[in-house]
C-alpha cells in the first residue's frame, strides 16, 4: 500500500524510558527505580489534585465538557486573558501540531534552533514543510533573523523554546520581544514556554508575559501542566494568543481531546500554587548541587533555566554512562537521538540526586 | 494572518451537550440531569476500573509507558493478534485521523455512507481530500461499489461504520467481507467498529472478526473503550491491521497520546467482561422498550444495532422536542447538524428510560 509522501521521511519520537521497561528488562523492582528522564515533577502530583482525581474517578465513563469552560475561565483569570484567547491541547505538544498543520505545508518552511524540542521537526515533516535550523545549537536570535531574512518568502512558522529543551538555556524576554517586532505579521511565532515557570523563578528577566503576547497578531504562548504542575501523565497543555489565531487552531482540535479526569486535575492544579512554589524552590536548590557536582567532576554543562540539566561529554560516551545508570535503576535521558554526546537529567528530590551523584561517580573516568 | 487553505472549509464537530451546560443554563442540579446524548455507558465505569484509577491516581505526574506494552498484550490476547498489529489512539477518533492523514490528500477522495460519523468528513477536509457519499443515508454496499468503480483513480480511503453512528443500522459481516474482496489493495478500508460489541450481541451475523481482517492487506478494524467498556471520558481506542499498515500509522502517533490513568483503566476494563455483558444485556432489553414506545407513538425509527436509537420526525421538529427535553434535564442528541429532523437517544438504565418516555409523551403531538 502506498502512503502519503510525507510519511517516508518520518521517524518516531524517542520517548524517555519508562519505569516499566527497567522492571521488565533488568528485573529491578518499580519502587527502586529512579526516573529522571522525562522532566516530570519529582514531588509527583499535588495531594489535593490526587484527591480530586479519586473523587472524579467514577466519571470516567462521561465525556468531558468539550467547551472546557471551567478550565479556560481559571486559566483566563490566571493570565489575565479572555477564554477566547485560550485553546486546550493534549499536552502543549498537540498545540504545536495544530500550529504546524494550520500554517505549514510543502511549500513553506519552519525555523528553529540548532538543537531544540524534537516534536517541532516531527510535526513539520508530517505536513511536508522544509526545516531551517540555526548553526548554533542554542538559541541565537541574530542567527534566527539572518535565516529569516534570507528565506522570508518561505518561512511560515518560527519556534522559540523558552527555556530550551533539551539544552536548558533561555533567551532574555526583552530580546524576544524585540525579535518579535522584526517578524512579519503573517509568520506564526510559537513561544514554547513549557518550562517557563522554572526560568522565571530563577531570573525574572526570562519570564514571558501573556499580556505582552496578546499585543502581537502572530504570536502564540504555549504552556503545560506536565512540568511545574505535576501532571505529565494527564496530558494537558494550553495556547494563548489573539482570538484570530485561536479560532483557526480550534478547527483542528478534535472533540474531547483531553480526558474527563485530566480536565478535573488541571482545574484543581491551578488552585494549588503552593505545590508549584515548593517545586520551583526545590528545583533551584538542587540545580545548584548539580552545577557544583559538574564543576568538581569537570563535566561540561549548560546553565539551565529548566527542571533538568544537560551534561555534555567529550571523551566518555554519554550513552554508555546512561546505560550503566539504567542497570542500576536510574533512568536518565540519553541525547543520542539529538545527535549529542550528552545526557539530560531531571532535577530530582534531594535523596534521588544523592543516588545520581553516587552512581555517576562510579562511571566517570 | 493567512492559514492553510484546508482550514477555510472546516467547521467544528458539534459534541453532545455536557451535563455542566444544563446546570449552567437551566439551573438544574447535576444529579437530576439524565444525559443520553453521547452514547456513554449507562452503568458508568466498572467498579473494578474505578478502583484501579483511584489506586493509580498518584501516578498522574508520570508519563505513561509509551510502548503501551501491557495494553497491547491484553488486546492481542483478546483478539488473537500480535502486538505489532495494534495501534492505540486517543479514542478510535484519533486513529481515524491517522488513517486520513496517512492516505488522503488534496488529490484523493474519501468514500462514506450518506449519513455517518461526522469525524470522517472533518478529518478528510483537514487534509483537503474530496468527499463522496452514497445517495442512501444508510450503508448500501451496491452504492459504495458503484461510486468506487466510477472514481477508482481518486478514492484512497473508504469508511464503513459497523454499526452506523448516528443511524444505528448494521451491514451483515458476510456482505462486508465480500465487499472487501472487490476493493483494490491500495485503498485503505476502515471498519469503524466502535459499537460492534452491541451489534454482535444482538445478532452474531454482524460481528466483525479481527482474524478475518488480518487476511486483507488494506483493512483496519477500529475499536474503542468508550462505549461497551464504559470509558468514554478516558479516550482510548485501538486499531487492528497488518503490521505494514500499523507501522505507517504509528509514524503519525505523537508520544503519550493517551494518559497514564487511561492506560491503566483500559487494561483493567479488559479484565471485567462481566460488566460488558451486563451492559449488553441491559441494552438489548431496554432497546426493545424504545422500539415498542416508538411503534405505539407512531414514531419512525431505524432498527438499531448500537446502544442508541434514532427517532425521525416528519411534522414535528426534533430540535424543538430535544430543546424541551433539555429544559427538563434530559439531554438527547439533536441530529440537526447531520441535516436530519431526528434525535438520537442513548439507551439508558430502566429508570432513566422511564423518565424519557414520560417526558417524550408530553412533547408528542
From Swiss-Prot, chains A, B:
Catalytic activity: L-histidinol phosphate + 2-oxoglutarate = 3-(imidazol-4-yl)-2-oxopropyl phosphate + L-glutamate
Pathway annotation from the record: Amino-acid biosynthesis; L-histidine biosynthesis; L-histidine from 5-phospho-alpha-D-ribose 1-diphosphate: step 7/9
Cofactor list: pyridoxal 5'-phosphate
Molecular-function annotations in GO: histidinol-phosphate transaminase activity; pyridoxal phosphate binding
GO biological process: L-histidine biosynthetic process
Keywords: Amino-acid biosynthesis, Aminotransferase, Histidine biosynthesis, Pyridoxal phosphate, Transferase
UniProt cross-references to SUPFAM superfamilies, sorted A to Z: PLP-dependent transferases (SSF53383)
Modified residues (N6-(pyridoxal phosphate)lysine): 227
Classification via Gene3D superfamilies: Aspartate Aminotransferase, domain 1, Type I PLP-dependent aspartate aminotransferase-like (Major domain)
Keyword Transferase: yes
EC number: 2.6.1.9
Top-level taxon of the source organism: Bacteria
Stated family: Belongs to the class-II pyridoxal-phosphate-dependent aminotransferase family. Histidinol-phosphate aminotransferase subfamily.
Binding partners and assembly: Homodimer.
NCBIfam families (alphabetical): hisC (TIGR01141)
Record protein name field: Histidinol-phosphate aminotransferase
Organism the protein comes from: Campylobacter curvus (strain 525.92)
Primary gene name: hisC
Amino acid at each position: 500500500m502506498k502512503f502519503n509522501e510525507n510519511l517516508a521521511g518520518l521517524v518516531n519520537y524517542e520517548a524517555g524510558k519508562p519505569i516499566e521497561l527497567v522492571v521488565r528488562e533488568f528485573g529491578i523492582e518499580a519502587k527502586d527505580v529512579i526516573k529522571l528522564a522525562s522532566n516530570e515533577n519529582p514531588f509527583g502530583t499535588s495531594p489535593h489534585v490526587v484527591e480530586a482525581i479519586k473523587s472524579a474517578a467514577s466519571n470516567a465513563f462521561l465525556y468531558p465538557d468539550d467547551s472546557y469552560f471551567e478550565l479556560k475561565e481559571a486559566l483566563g483569570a490566571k493570565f489575565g486573558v479572555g477564554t477566547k484567547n485560550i485553546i486546550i491541547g493534549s499536552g502543549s505538544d498537540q498545540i504545536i501540531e495544530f500550529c504546524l498543520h494550520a500554517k505549514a505545508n510543502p511549500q513553506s518552511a519552519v525555523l528553529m534552533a540548532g538543537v531544540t524540542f524534537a516534536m517541532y521537526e516531527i510535526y513539520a515533516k508530517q505536513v511536508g514543510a522544509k526545516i531551517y535550523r540555526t548553526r548554533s545549537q542554542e538559541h541565537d536570535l541574530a542567527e534566527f533573523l539572518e535565516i529569516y531574512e534570507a528565506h522570508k518568502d518561505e518561512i511560515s512558522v518560527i519556534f522559540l523554546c523558552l527555556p530550551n529543551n533539551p539544552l536548558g538555556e533561555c533567551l532574555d524576554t526583552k530580546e524576544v520581544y524585540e525579535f518579535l517586532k522584526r517578524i512579519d505579521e503573517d509568520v506564526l511565532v510559537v513561544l514554547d514556554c513549557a518550562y517557563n515557570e522554572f526560568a522565571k523563578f530563577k531570573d525574572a528577566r526570562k519570564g514571558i508575559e501573556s499580556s505582552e503576547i496578546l499585543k502581537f497578531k502572530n504570536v502564540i504562548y504555549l504552556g503545560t501542566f506536565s512540568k511545574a504542575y505535576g501532571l505529565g501523565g494527564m496530558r494537558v497543555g494550553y495556547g494563548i494568543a489573539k482570538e484570530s489565531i485561536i479560532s483557526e487552531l480550534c478547527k483542528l482540535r478534535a472533540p474531547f481531546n483531553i480526558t474527563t479526569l485530566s480536565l478535573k486535575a488541571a482545574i484543581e492544579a491551578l488552585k494549588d500554587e503552593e505545590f508549584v512554589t515548593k517545586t520551583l524552590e526545590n528545583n533551584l536548590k538542587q540545580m545548584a548541587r548539580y552545577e557544583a557536582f559538574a564543576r568538581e567532576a569537570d563535566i561540561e554543562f549548560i546553565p539551565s533555566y529548566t527542571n533538568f540539566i544537560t551534561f555534555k561529554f567529550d571523551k566518555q560516551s554519554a550513552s554508555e554512562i546512561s546505560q550503566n545508570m539504567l542497570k542500576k535503576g536510574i533512568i536518565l535521558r540519553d541525547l543520542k537521538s539529538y545527535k549529542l554526546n550528552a545526557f539530560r537529567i531531571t532535577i530530582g528530590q534531594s535523596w534521588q540526586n544523592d543516588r545520581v551523584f553516587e552512581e555517576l561517580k562510579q562511571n566517570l573516568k
